[in-house]
């Protein structure tokens, strides 16, 4: 039975975003007051992320025949993340040097309002590779779940999964309980996702209502340059990776179109993390691979954020006439290879990492962040969308390299064909 287009999440979210843009543009004061709708939806999603990751990772690892396979999957995923993230950083660096969107602005850093970025600078001072690594270890298991720290929950879930696997038959009862709990959790997700159009409407109405479409004009060159770079990265880089691994990037984008629209409305790739876990498993990737790659990718494989970081940093240098030679840019790249791993898939984290990077490099004026602050919210959509597509592609590629991919199921799903063993648990229509 064919579902009416009006009942699909895709249509509902697209309609909600359109209404949000119109409300924010024509009635900005009312639009700005819609922020709680977007915030509330994202909070509902965050509420469920920790248990989803725990259940997915534990059942995935405990259900595997060999523990060596888990270690191999993790190693391959991290290698992939590092290579592709580095490519994203390099592409952002090359494009911003060629396009030079900041040249000619001739802004004196002394005239910029440093107070506007003081909070971000303070948060950035706490960034660093050692604190980041130590922060992965939770002070307590309860604290990890309470704060919703993805990497902390992931670490505990991996250890729990290993321990449960070692118990063998003795741990079967616990395994069954967690698997049943997982089904309940995904039922809760389906209920929450019915509110996605409302969340997308609120977030978009607030963005347009508060900042206005006109605020994009002055710094439009950077925004346009960034969006085009993200599109080129997805089509050329991720498209090439997809082609060499046996699937079409455009078919994959069509497959996750509902998730992309939700991310477009909320500006946070984290808002669809639970659905992506389910959809990637539905696409033929084994649960153990999905449970490791997707959550880890939210900190280690943020392609859109990587592009943004190099472009924004060099843009500030160009706009303030701060000279950056080859060595300065190489230093920037090296620092970003480390600092970019501290970003999470949530709105605003990329800006904090940018502040941390500029502080660490020392050559760029920190006050220059004020130039980016006003348009950062408009760039977050492209960041989040690119991050989402990048993590989806990474999951399929790692699953294939680890021989944990059902290619027939993948091709059937991407071609809109239904196999008897394909579950359709992601439908919320």
UniProtKB/Swiss-Prot annotation:
Listed InterPro entries: C4_dicarb_transport, Na-dicarboxylate_symporter, Na-dicarboxylate_symporter_CS, Na:dicarbo_symporter_sf
Pfam family, any one: SDF
UniProt subcellular location: Cell inner membrane
Record bears the keyword Ubl conjugation: no
PROSITE patterns recorded: NA_DICARBOXYL_SYMP_1, NA_DICARBOXYL_SYMP_2
Keyword GTP-binding (UniProt): no
GO cellular component, one term: plasma membrane
Function of the protein: Responsible for the transport of dicarboxylates such as succinate, fumarate, and malate from the periplasm across the membrane.
Record-stated family: Belongs to the dicarboxylate/amino acid:cation symporter (DAACS) (TC 2.A.23) family.
Name of the protein in its database record: C4-dicarboxylate transport protein
Organism field: Yersinia pseudotuberculosis serotype O:1b (strain IP 31758)
